[in-house]
Amino acid sequence: MPAALTRRSAMALSAVCLSCLMFGLEISSIPAILPTLERKLHADFKQLQWIMNAYTIAVTTVLMATGTLADRYGRKRIFMIATAAFGVTSLSCGVTENVLTLIVARFLQGLSGGAMLICQIAVLSHQFQGGRERATAFGWWGVIFGIGLGFGPIIGGAIAALLSWTWVFLIHVVFAILAILLAIGGIQESRDPKAGSLDLAGMLTLSLSVFCLAFYITQGPDLGFGSATGLTILGAAIASLIAFLIAEKVSPRPMFDVLVFRIPAFSGAVVGSAAMNISFWPFMIYLPIWFQAGLGYDSVTAGLALLAYTVPTLVMPPLGERLSLRYRPGVVIPAGLFTIGAGFMLMKLGSAAAQPDWLTMLPGCLIAGIGLGLTNTPVTNTTTGSVTSDRAGMASGIDISARMVSLTVNIAVMGFLLASGVLAHLEDALPDSPDAGELWPLAERIAAGNAVSVPGLPEAVVHEALAQGFGWVMLYGGIGVWALAGVSFVIFRTRSLQPAE
């Protein structure tokens, strides 16, 4: 820790960094153990998706509300409560022996994690107000967050191999206790006497809309996308979204001030946030399945292979920021997104090789990671820098919410495409195969990485089916991020519909 910081400030920064390490690890380490959870807890493919989506939906639910609560009741107090809750819910995740209980515990963990994330920013913003100290604090916060995200796969895989999958969750109990002890002596309490009221209507309608859409996509094959039940759920998602927009328009203190979307730089950057989560981050949920079930690697080797995908996201942001200052975010953000898409197309080619392995996947993984690293920092800085200082907190909340919402939806979309690609190959490869409805459960088992326990099905057919499914997902990720790169590029070049105050 830099010597320039006082002892109390160093303790506060250490507490915040420990909590952001926990949050980052819970996003990136869990994908590495999904194949293990499938075996140990007998989780099916949909349940694996909900283990991830329960967390992201919960984070989205609590993000904006926590900022208001922290301003009103004390940022230190809410930070400590959220961190303690994260430790307790992590303990619940680690001791469960039932997948449904794990999904519920993951939702509760996401609520506490989202609250913890917002409090981290609030604590740092208040405690480190000098220019140099502030830069140091946020610099360390970003580095530790990046380590959690970038090295999470290998950390999760190593813990699962050396100890047990349960310790991927239980380790956070230790971190949470340390963070709370540091926070007690280090973080200064602060409040905002002008804190507004909670936007409960906005919070609930947005969360309901995201949940219903994710549920419709994930459970649609079983319910029937065109069935009365399926259409009712889809209708609820649309109605909730409309209700959210109305609530934000009439609320005196909305979570989302829709007027900021009239600022092209802000809107273009938010599209960039969504684009990263239509491709890069949701695919990290499924890539360990390909490395383990498709390429035959164990959890540690799969985690090492994933470093090619994640490490560039740690080393490229400084270059992305320099390029943004030189060529403008409106050029760098779409270019970074285009690079991610190129990486996905190369991964698709690598997975379709006659004998695919980590070397055939390496170029695409590296290029996708480089593209993410070039894009992420300019997106964050542009969303907050394109609005006035009094709107910066709201702009940051919209940015994070856009990431979480698009991540949640695209975890479901990629899962559906993966299973659909597997199903399409099975229908072509198996003579006299039953109809799609009967083959769908088998396709989901293969998509979950459960290829070994498919009796009577040639191993080559299983592998080819899995490869086709992942090919569909990579194609979707590449085309999707390219499309949004084009949208972002166009938006950046439109005239502002209102002055960027």
Region annotations inferred by a language model:
Residues 161-173, 219-230, 420-479:
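A membrane-interface helix-boundary motif in multi-pass transporters
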Residues 139, 161-273, 279, 297, ...:
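Hydrophobic transmembrane-helix bundles of small-molecule transporters
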